[in-house]
Each structure stands twice: as C-alpha cells, then as structure tokens.
C-alpha cells in the first residue's frame, strides 16, 4: 500500500494507522505531506511534554551531537552523570539506571525487585500488580500488566505476577505471602481509561508494603515529568516509593527512560543490568533539556492551572451532551462517553484536523503538551463539541 509519495508495506503492520504521513511538527501542531495541519492532543501518548520539536530539545541535541554521540556504556559520560544527579536531587531516590523505553525501565524494576528478594527475602519473587494496569510490551511487562487483550498472547507468560483490584487494599493484602517481594502499579492507569489510584489508596499501600517488608514500585512513565502538575505524581500523596520508573516525557520525544531506586532497593551488582545505548549522551542531553524547562519557575503551576481549565471545559462538554464526566489529574484526563463511540469520534476529529485518543471504546484520553495554550484548548473543545452535537443529532434521528 502506498500514498502518492510514500510506500507503507516495508513497515510491519502492527497497528491500524490513518494514511496521513507526518513530516513536520511545532508546538501543539503537526503537518502531513499534503500540508494539512493537525492540533495534537495526543503528543505521542504523553511523550512530547514540551510539544513538537521544541527549540530547547533541538538545540541540546544539535550541540551534543557535535561533541559526543556515544562512548559506550562501559564509560562515564557527562550528560548521563548530570541527568542522574538532577533526578536524584529532585526526587526521593538515590540512584538511577537509564534505559531506552518505559518497557525496558519496567523490566529493570522487575529484575531489581527479584534481585532484592533473592538477597533479602529468602528468594521471594512474586510481584502484585493490578487489573487494568499496563507496564509495556516485553514478555515480562506484558505478564505484569492487567490488560485483558494481553491474556491470550505469547503464552506461556512469565510467572510470578498476581493481580489485585485498584483502590481495594483488601484485595492486595490477601495476595501477600512468603513469596511476595513487591507491589507494582501506575498512579493513574492510562491505557485502561485514565483510572486514578486515590491518594488514600496509595497511602494505605505504602503502609501495607512497609508492614510486610515489601518494595513499592510506581510506574510513572505516563504520569511523571510534570504531567499531573508535580514533577512526579507520588508528590501529591505524601508518600514515596522504593522504586520508580520514568519514560515518555523524560525525553520529550527522544527515546529515554529511567529506573530510579532508593539506596535500600538499589541492589544490582555488576553484570545484572545493562544495555548498549543506556545512558547515551544524546538521549541524556534531551532529558536535561526537558528537566531544565519543567523546572523553570511557575512551569508546574501553569500545568496545574491549564489542567484545571481543560478539566472544566471537558466537564461542560460532558454536561451539555449527557456524558459520564471527567477523570484524571493535571494534563492527563479522560472523558467518559458512556457509549462505545470513542473510535468514531477520534476518526471524525482526525478528518477535522484534531488528534485525539481512545484508550477504550467509551473513553477519550487527553494528553496535550504541558505548555498547551488556552486558545489551543478552546480549538479542541470546539471541534469535540461539534462532533458530539452531530453524533447526538444522528442518534435522535435513528
């Protein structure tokens, strides 16, 4: 299959894609090869936290590319040392391992927990994760995930994962046994439809894991780097995990992820973990640029304010069209449509030049750039409102 200028069939057909081919991006907008402009409220699934091709990242990449691409992970390099120090200084953790993707960071978290169990808990290896959770597409992270669609795939799965119910502390407690080493979850389950763990539940979970000597692992791949109005979501809750993973926004569009751990949990020994591009100077230069921007005065305050504005506007849409309300935090929000019409709305919005996401058939997810403007929010809301009005009229006629 081809467009006028681009063949498709050399790429593995792993997902349904619209036929547009994007060639340029700036801020909250993308342009395809026919010069059509799109307002992007997906941003690579919360990857482009500063929008498309921001000068801060582009300049950092260009400067680093002229200095050093990679010396091998067998040697230290300046950007990785600086980024690790900055992450430690701005978090509850003591050490960092850099990875190429969120799935790789989560795989590392699973390995680290098992290593901890081997050293300190008599070989305990089981990890309690959650129904509806999503931790990646490696075999182990798919096994840790609670995504129904994964269940029949690539059997046999990796053993050692038990699933509890989100926001149900009793369901966690009853799964704990002598083989349990950790509890792993996303503070907000993105792929299942933006379902937040309550602050109270996370506090109860922290108390429970401490009481049983278990590690608490937070997957902040989608919620981290300012997405919810704090640098890391756990800061909203008054607790701190033992292990945290980052991805998506930490690279601002460049493949970068991180595994962070407290001194107590950071028990890897030489040879336990590694990778050819881990801590690559180019990737870490992008991470430093992102952290510098997100750390500027009032940046996170602006994310909170903009998130409240987007939530308010979506609530108005929900009320006007008799929908199921809004959930989420900051600039990671979902609109409950109450009907399985989300894919159709996404398709119509695409034709109208607005990119939206449907993690479930009855849910729209919103993940704009953290510096999205009020005017851009208004533009998206106008488009969504028009589509829902048309859909409502069609249902009434039917």
UniProtKB/Swiss-Prot annotation:
Residue(s) carrying N6-(pyridoxal phosphate)lysine: 248
Class of the enzyme per the UniProt entry, highest EC level: transferase
Pfam family, one: Aminotran_3
MF (Gene Ontology): identical protein binding; N2-acetyl-L-ornithine:2-oxoglutarate 5-aminotransferase activity; pyridoxal phosphate binding
Signal peptide: none
One BP annotation, GO: L-arginine biosynthetic process
Keywords: Amino-acid biosynthesis, Aminotransferase, Arginine biosynthesis, Cytoplasm, Pyridoxal phosphate, Transferase
EC number assigned by the record: 2.6.1.11
Pathways involved: Amino-acid biosynthesis; L-arginine biosynthesis; N(2)-acetyl-L-ornithine from L-glutamate: step 4/4
Principal localisation: cytoplasm
Binding site for N(2)-acetyl-L-ornithine: 137
CDD domains hit by this protein: OAT_like
Localization: Cytoplasm
Family: Belongs to the class-III pyridoxal-phosphate-dependent aminotransferase family. ArgD subfamily.
Further details from the record: May also have succinyldiaminopimelate aminotransferase activity, thus carrying out the corresponding step in lysine biosynthesis.
Name listed for the protein in its UniProt record: Acetylornithine aminotransferase 2
Organism of derivation: Bradyrhizobium diazoefficiens (strain JCM 10833 / BCRC 13528 / IAM 13628 / NBRC 14792 / USDA 110)
Gene that encodes it: argD2
């Amino acid at each position: 299959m081809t467009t006028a200028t681009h063949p498709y069939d050399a790429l593995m057909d792993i997902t349904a894609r619209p036929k547009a081919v994007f060639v340029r991006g700036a801020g909250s907008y993308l342009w395809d090869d026919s010069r059509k402009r799109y307002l992007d409220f997906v941003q690579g699934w919360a990857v482009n936290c500063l929008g498309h091709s921001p000068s801060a990242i582009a300049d950092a990449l260009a400067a680093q590319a002229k200095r050093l691409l990679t010396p091998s992970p067998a040697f230290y390099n300046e950007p990785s040392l600086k980024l690790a120090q900055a992450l430690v200084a701005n978090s509850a953790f003591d050490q960092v391992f850099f990875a190429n993707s969120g799935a790789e960071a989560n795989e590392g978290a699973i390995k680290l927990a098992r290593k901890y169990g081997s050293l300190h808990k008599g070989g305990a290896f089981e990890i309690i994760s959650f129904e509806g959770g999503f931790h990646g597409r490696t075999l182990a992270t798919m096994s840790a995930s609670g995504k129904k669609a994964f269940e029949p795939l690539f059997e046999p799965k990796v053993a050692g994962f038990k699933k509890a119910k989100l926001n149900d502390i009793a369901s966690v407690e009853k799964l704990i046994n002598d083989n349990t080493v950790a509890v792993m979850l996303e503070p907000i389950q993105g792929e299942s439809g933006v379902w937040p763990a309550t602050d109270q539940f996370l506090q109860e979970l922290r108390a429970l894991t401490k009481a049983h000597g278990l590690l608490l692992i937070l997957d902040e791949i989608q919620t981290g780097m300012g997405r919810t109005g704090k640098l890391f979501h756990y800061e909203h809750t008054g607790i701190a995990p033992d292990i945290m993973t980052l991805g998506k926004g930490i690279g601002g569009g460049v493949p970068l992820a991180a595994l962070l751990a407290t001194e107590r949990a950071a028990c890897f020994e030489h040879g336990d973990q590694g990778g050819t591009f881990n801590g690559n100077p180019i990737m870490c230069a992008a991470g430093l640029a992102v952290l510098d921007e997100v750390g500027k005065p009032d940046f996170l305050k602006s994310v909170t304010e903009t998130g409240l504005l987007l939530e308010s506007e979506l609530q108005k849409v929900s009320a006007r069209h008799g929908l199921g309300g809004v959930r989420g935090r900051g600039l990671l929000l979902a609109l409950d449509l109450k009907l399985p019409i989300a894919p159709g709305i996404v398709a119509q919005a695409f034709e109208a030049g607005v990119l939206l996401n449907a993690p479930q058939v009855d849910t729209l997810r919103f993940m704009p750039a953290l510096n999205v403007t009020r005017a851009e929010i208004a533009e998206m809301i106008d488009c969504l409102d028009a589509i829902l009005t048309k859909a409502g009229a069609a249902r009434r006629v039917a």
